[in-house]
Each structure stands twice: as C-alpha cells, then as structure tokens.
C-alpha cells in the first residue's frame, strides 16, 4: 500500500502528483457513491468522473469493493462496511494531515 498523505502539487513546488494508493482510490469511489446516493440514482459514469478513473479500472475496483463487501452492485450502493471504511479513512487522513502541519510545516531552514 502507498502513502496515505498527499503531497502538495501546486505549481509553487513543481512536483508531480504521486500515484494514488489503493486506499485513496477506494475512498474516492466510495465517496463518489455516497454523494450520488444523496442525489438519487447512482450511475457508474458519474462515479467514474468523480473518482477520476478510466472505465475499465473503475469496473475492476468496483469488483474488488463488492468482493470486500463494501458495496452492492445491483443497485450500486454502499454497505455498512463501506460507510465504516469511509469514516475510518477520513479520520485517519485528518489525523495524518494534522501531523504534517504540526511537524512538517515551516521546517525548511528552521531549528533542528
């Protein structure tokens, strides 16, 4: 599994955006499904656009998520486990983001 922390990719740092980890992709897909459920019917093409994946990759990840019992596919929706994953992932990501700000912000040239 890759890193859970995103690197700032603004033009100021000039770094390319790192590839997303599988957990980030799962979170993006599950989050897109959650948003679509609020609006009504969940359409795969809208999940594809919101999760920024090619359709063949989206199909593969949907199969993985169904196998892990995080989604239902007919109709497309979240299971309790999928909702729990999103809550836990968001909590962990928030914690890691806070740590990055606390320990890494402004450290360039500062006291060690």
Language-model region placement:
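Short amphipathic alpha-helical interaction segments
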Residues: 52-67
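Secretory targeting signatures
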Residues: 1-2, 29
């Amino acid at each position: 599994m890759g890193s859970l922390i995103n690197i700032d990719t603004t033009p100021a740092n000039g770094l390319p955006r790192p590839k997303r980890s599988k957990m980030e992709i799962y979170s993006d897909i599950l989050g897109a499904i959650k948003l679509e459920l609020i609006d009504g019917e969940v359409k795969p093409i809208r999940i594809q656009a919101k999760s920024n994946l090619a359709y063949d990759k989206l199909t593969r990840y949907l199969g993985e998520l169904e196998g892990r019992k995080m989604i239902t596919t007919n109709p497309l929706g979240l299971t309790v486990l999928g909702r729990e994953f999103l809550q836990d992932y968001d909590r962990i990501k928030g914690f890691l983001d806070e740590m990055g700000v606390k320990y890494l912000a402004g450290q360039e040239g500062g006291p060690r």
